[in-house]
Amino acid sequence: MLPDVIFVGPTKCGTTWIDTYLRTREEVVLPSDCKETFFFDKAFDKGVPWYESHFRGQGGTCVEVAPSLFHKPDALANVRAVCPNARIVIMFRDPFERVVSHYFHYRKQGVAQMPVAEMATRHPDMIEASLFHKYSLMWMEAFPGQVSFVSYDLLKSDPVGFCSVICDVTGIPDTVPPADALAGRAVNAASLPRSAALAHVTRRGAELARRMGGHGLVNWLRKTGLKKLAFSGGGDVSAERDAVKHDVLGLTPQLAPDLSAFNATYGKKINGI
């Protein structure tokens, strides 16, 4: 079984929430032992049978939520080769807000506080994953007529309406979500680790386990509370967040032209605007 629908990201655009919601839907088949397989960008050498083994459901709509793929041309080529008929879903978020969230993603993993520009130099994906026009164009060209856009803002303002949009682009019945499907499904909030060293070691260990095929182990450890222990508990981030929101405006030359081009080309195609 291969995906009928792939949410290609980018990261920090509500994809964890989407994966969690879709797992409440019996008619949807997702990877059984992990959220994201990283097959198309990090594990393609393992082969298609290995990838298919993650989808163990009986029938239904097969979906992977894989936000790491959006800004990676090689991953796009791999998706095109293996799943040429898949529906591709791109999540749109204000690129400046997305960079701020991505900054705190690295802070949460134990990276030291630094200016946004320096963080972006060390981690180029902070900017690359916010270039919505550049990479949406690539996906549109590779999958003509198969790409949908969904607004992250709708998730924050109207979760039930957001679920309806997700049902539409996924091709599953749009039913009123039960209360327990939305309870506790808050959008990921920024946090800092109680120990940068512990967060760093935990992240590296998880990456190594995934490379060795230990997705199930990583998923089990998440359920034990290790993720919360390693990546949170470090105090209030509000002051740093305010500074980062101001600092990110320095990236206007890199982000604004692409945003203008995206709005002009795809703005009317976004679900939830």
Placement of each model-derived feature along the sequence:
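Anion-recognition interface
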Residues: M1-I273
